[in-house]
């Protein structure tokens, strides 16, 4: 049915959703429950980013029981496990079949503008008009790289995290992974387990326990209300949206990542990447500081769980205090890596948003959407699926349903109000004739 829209030069819709990921599908389902049938425009296909922009051994870092899309709770045999990318794609596709929304795949939105209270969308396959628009394209669009990355010799392959698949897909030789967030640490481990020579540039990313005092840490944090805490109640609401996620893994049925252990086993750790030339790469002498900082967050999480257990009188097994068991021997000037000893550099330094196609003044000076729980100052324009849209869970499988239901209420109210206004105007016209 959705393909019928392409037969029109300018298709008109009540609500258009841009993006058919978990956020777009969730808001579509919530709207349909209120009698509103939206149209979803998807640049690629359902599940694309999970299938094509994740490495082969990728797994969720949160347990499967947290996959709670609207009216579609995970129902598999391993609620405490961690879905691999193949099963994540299956989960999303099955949810798409459950939602039964009108989805146009292969539609890339080029321009969105608002005129006379209507939204006009230009795409690679035609134009669309809508009364209300929901942008569900996420926040991670353009990879970050060091500004001097082009200085590296051309014989060194440079790729971003979303381009990495497995160790065998890379040329032989040593690999430098830049960035120690979730992607960087997990990719470095993936290569290390395949006996590759791995160099990891460690930044200030925090790390998290995997299991503690008898439960997965996600279970404890969920019980403590962290995933449902509104951003306004956070200690640092201004910067929390930009903070790096804690590193740990869902691989091997879930475990911690302790870079000190990997160093003992032979992984080469360096401080933050400082400078690049055609001959060598210079790292800062902050490796000890960065490892200590990650451990400090790790211990704070454990301590907060201890306090909550004590406060609520919960019977849980005790665990010993964490003690670092490896320290780097750093030179005052940091370490240096010669380019001739490298074959690949993988940039795991995050992504930035790119909403330049949205020609509506709803952004701050850095291109980030300004909104109140997804509602912008432009009447009828919304965002969903952004990190910390409202809670920590907003950008995850566990919290998007609450945002979807919230926005569906607002969209429905405005749809009904618009319909009532139109009906009143038609009645007045008839009475006046």
What are these regions (language model features)?
Residues 2-20, 25-52, 81-433:
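Flavin (primarily FAD) cofactor-binding/catalytic cores of flavoenzymes
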Residues 45-71, 262:
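Redox-cofactor-proximal catalytic regions of oxidoreductases
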Residues 75-80:
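A short acidic, helix-capping loop that chelates divalent metal ions and anchors anionic groups
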